[in-house]
Amino acid sequence: MRTATIKRKTKETDIEVAVNLDGSGVSSVATGIGFFDHMLDLLARHSRIDIMVKADGDLHVDYHHTTEDVGIALGQAVKQALGTMAGITRYACAHMPMDETLSRVVIDISGRPMLVFKVEFPRDKIGEFDTELVREWFNAFAVNAGVTLHVETLYGENSHHIAESCFKGLARALRAAVAIDPRAAGEVPSTKGQLGG
């Protein structure tokens, strides 16, 4: 089983994250941020990755530290669970509709972290959640997972739908990219013989 647990404690947050890449999409998420919990539940369900997140953050300041630090810890957990990355599919692309919105998420589990994020929100907030934090989370996740990630909303009008289509798109892309390719026979999917450089 490809699993990992990460604990991260700073003066701003205390976070524990666990993942099982070969799970069934079970989630147990408690960050204290309702909308964010919803997005992480969706990520687990549609990626079929079991995700557990417990976060205690300085929400009296704002949601930034908790959101970013969960992205850091979850990215680290995925990277650790991938291990040598032998046999993985590596590349994947997902187009994700959410009513009037369509987003595209493309991933390369390359070991070379990068985020390209072309998403615009018509509103500054979704409930009490700052929409700019969606990018912060994706960046923290991509950098710490060691993946190249392109996220683009092709069109959309509702901020909730836009965010949800991005998280669901990541879920479906991750599901395909971390899957073991039976034809790869345990090989690292790179002509270099290694990923990450």
UniProtKB/Swiss-Prot annotation:
It catalyses: D-erythro-1-(imidazol-4-yl)glycerol 3-phosphate = 3-(imidazol-4-yl)-2-oxopropyl phosphate + H2O. It comes from the Bacteria. Keywords: Amino-acid biosynthesis, Cytoplasm, Histidine biosynthesis, Lyase. The keyword Cytoplasm applies. One of its GO terms (cellular component) is cytoplasm. Its EC number is 4.2.1.19. It is found in: Cytoplasm. HAMAP family: HisB. Belongs to the imidazoleglycerol-phosphate dehydratase family. This is Imidazoleglycerol-phosphate dehydratase. It comes from Nitrobacter hamburgensis (strain DSM 10229 / NCIMB 13809 / X14).
